[in-house]
UniProtKB/Swiss-Prot annotation:
Signal peptide: none annotated. This is Ribosome maturation factor RimM. InterPro entries: PRC_barrel-like_sf (IPR011033), PRC_RimM (IPR056792), RimM (IPR011961), RimM_N (IPR002676), RimM_N_sf (IPR036976), Transl_B-barrel_sf (IPR009000). The gene is rimM. It comes from Acaryochloris marina (strain MBIC 11017). An accessory protein needed during the final step in the assembly of 30S ribosomal subunit, possibly for assembly of the head region. Essential for efficient processing of 16S rRNA. May be needed both before and after RbfA during the maturation of 16S rRNA. It has affinity for free ribosomal 30S subunits but not for 70S ribosomes.
C-alpha cells in the first residue's frame, strides 16, 4: 500500500523555502573511479538510475543542499543497494568523502501514485481510529517493511506502540486529506 520517499522538512531549505525528499544515503565508495553505493529510501528506481539533477546534503553539518548531476546508476540486487556515478566525483577518495551524505530530490518531484498507494511521509502523524467504535487508537509513527508493510501505531496517551499489517482488510479507510486512518484490529491487539 505505501510507497516510500522520506519528506525531510528538517533539512535546510533554500531561499524559496521548499521541502526536500530524502531518497537515499551514500554508504560508501564502489571501485576506484568515483562511483558510490547508495542505500535507497525510495521505492522509485528511477531516482537512482535516470540521469538528471539531484542534491546532496551532509547529515553532520547544517548546510544547504548542493546540486549534483547523476550520470548513471544500477541496482545490485544481492546487496539491495544502487551503485551510482555522480558528476565530478572521479576518484575513490572523493566518493569515500561522501559516505553518510543524503541524496535528495525536490518535494515537487514526487511521481503520481496509483490508487491505494501512499507516501510514507503522508502517513506519519496521521490519527488512527477504530473503524467500528470510532474511538481514537493513536497515531502512525513509522512503517516497518516485512512480508507486508506494517504500520507502527503509538497508542493514545501512552508510549506503547503496536504493529498492524497495512492491508485493506485491517486498514479499510485511509484519508490523507483529513489525516485519518480507520482500522479493524484483530481482537487482543489493542489493550483495553
Amino acid at each position: 500500500m505505501p510507497v516510500s520517499d522520506s519528506l525531510s522538512p528538517d533539512l535546510p531549505n533554500d531561499d524559496t523555502s521548499e521541502e526536500w525528499l530524502e531518497v537515499g544515503t551514500i554508504v560508501g565508495a564502489h571501485g576506484l573511479n568515483g562511483e558510490v553505493k547508495v542505500y535507497p529510501d525510495s521505492d522509485f528506481p528511477e531516482r537512482f538510475t535516470q540521469p538528471g539533477l539531484r542534491w546532496l546534503v551532509s547529515p553532520t553539518e547544517a548546510s544547504t543542499p548542493e546540486e549534483i548531476q547523476l550520470i548513471r546508476g544500477r541496482f545490485v540486487e544481492r546487496k539491495g543497494i544502487y551503485v551510482v556515478k555522480l558528476a565530478n566525483v572521479n576518484f575513490r577518495d572523493q566518493s569515500e568523502a561522501l559516505k553518510g551524505t543524503k541524496l535528495l530530490v525536490r518535494s515537487n518531484d514526487r511521481p503520481t501514485l496509483a490508487e491505494g498507494e501512499y507516501y510514507l511521509s503522508d502517513l506519519i502523524g496521521v490519527t488512527v481510529v477504530d473503524h467500528q467504535t470510532q474511538a481514537v487508537v493513536g497515531s502512525v509513527v513509522s512503517l516497518a517493511s516485512a512480508g507486508n508493510d506494517l504500520l507502527e501505531i503509538q497508542l493514545d496517551n501512552t508510549t506503547k506502540t503496536i504493529l498492524l499489517p497495512f492491508v485493506s482488510a485491517l486498514v479499510p479507510i485511509v484519508d490523507i486529506a483529513t489525516k485519518r486512518i480507520e482500522i479493524t484490529p484483530p481482537k487482543g491487539l489493542i489493550p483495553e
